[in-house]
């Protein structure tokens, strides 16, 4: 619930609202339907998040933050423990609620989502600039 799934949605948010590169924005639009249901392969292989330092580092930071906050929230009684297994393809906030049967899990999920977006912004801006330079090189070679 609170691991990498939130980070992928933060990447998706940044692709659609922070990045200006045409390729990244179109990837962001194309990945929305599948990412809503936790199918993140378009992002994993399209951005890519594997072997790309500008997406790998913030992903690991976000996973650490998400897991620590979720654990501490559960330990402190801010949300209930996970009490049931639900299908992984449910939209993430609904997954958080149904697996804990606690509305506070949704609140914590959205707080973590906002934190993940903030963590990713500088990295995605750098990646956006890198993609722009790549596009310039490709257009120069084509001329």
Region locations from a protein language model:
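Transmembrane alpha-helical segments and their short flanking loops
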Residues: 1, 10-12, 30, 44-143
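Membrane-embedded helical hairpins/re-entrant loop segments and their flanking transmembrane helices
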Residues: 7-36
């Amino acid at each position: 619930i609170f691991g990498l799934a939130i980070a992928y949605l933060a990447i998706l948010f940044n692709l659609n609202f922070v990045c200006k590169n045409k390729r990244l924005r179109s990837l962001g639009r194309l990945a929305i339907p599948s990412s809503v249901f936790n199918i993140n392969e378009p992002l994993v292989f399209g951005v890519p998040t594997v072997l790309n330092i500008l997406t790998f580092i913030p992903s690991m930071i976000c996973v650490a933050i998400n897991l620590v906050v979720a654990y501490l929230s559960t330990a402190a009684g801010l949300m209930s423990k996970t009490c049931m297994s639900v299908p992984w393809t449910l939209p993430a906030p609904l997954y958080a609620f149904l697996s804990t049967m606690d509305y506070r899990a949704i609140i914590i999920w959205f707080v973590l989502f906002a934190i993940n977006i903030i963590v990713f912004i500088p990295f995605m801006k750098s990646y956006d600039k890198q993609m722009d330079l790549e596009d310039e090189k490709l257009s120069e070679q084509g001329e």
